[in-house]
């Protein structure tokens, strides 16, 4: 079935996610239309590598969402998504200050089928435990898996698509 409408993400997020996944020509080519037609300022890219910088950025971003939510009167949800569980940041220090939003860390796999107002993606850099994963699969596992795909990182691209499309309003 060719699903062409999304109720979860806005049009800007749908455009970025679709464009990314469809770089793989084996993927079903389609145009995805969102109910929310917003396309401006819906994906923000930051390149941070040091743990302290990442924690400061997360704290600042979550507090900005919290404060904006106070103004709108609507409590907002945030997913912090990482490729692996060890990407989970320690943000316990800001919990007492959050009245207008909630945040939760999830792996990208565990976020499938879920939605949050905002998504912050972690670990989008190169390396062994980064995203996309560069670790080789266990040779025994390869015996039961289907043949490798022609397009590099095809499964990682699909997983990244999942991560992007968990957000309703904005992806960081």
Outline where the language-model segments fall:
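A polyampholytic, Gly/Pro-enriched intrinsically disordered region
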Residues: 22-25, 51-54, 123-131
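Conserved helicase/translocase motor-coupling segment
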Residues: 49-114, 118, 123
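Glycine-rich phosphate-binding "P-loop"
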Residues: 30-60
């Amino acid at each position: 079935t060719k699903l062409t409408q999304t109720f979860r993400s806005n049009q800007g997020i749908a455009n970025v996610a679709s464009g990314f996944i469809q770089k793989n020509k084996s993927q079903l080519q389609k145009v995805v239309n969102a109910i929310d037609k917003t396309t401006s300022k819906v994906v923000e890219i930051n390149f941070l590598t040091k743990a302290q910088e990442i924690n400061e950025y997360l704290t600042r971003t979550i507090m900005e969402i919290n404060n904006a939510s106070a103004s709108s009167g609507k409590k907002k949800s945030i997913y912090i998504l990482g490729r692996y569980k060890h990407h989970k940041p320690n943000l316990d220090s800001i919990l007492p200050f959050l009245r207008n939003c909630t945040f939760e860390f999830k792996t990208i796999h565990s976020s499938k089928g879920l939605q949050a107002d905002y998504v912050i993606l972690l670990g989008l850099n190169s390396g062994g435990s980064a995203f996309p994963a560069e670790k080789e699969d266990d040779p025994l596992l390869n015996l039961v898996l289907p043949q490798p795909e022609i397009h590099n990182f095809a499964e990682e691209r699909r997983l990244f698509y999942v991560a992007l499309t968990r957000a309703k309003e904005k992806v960081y």
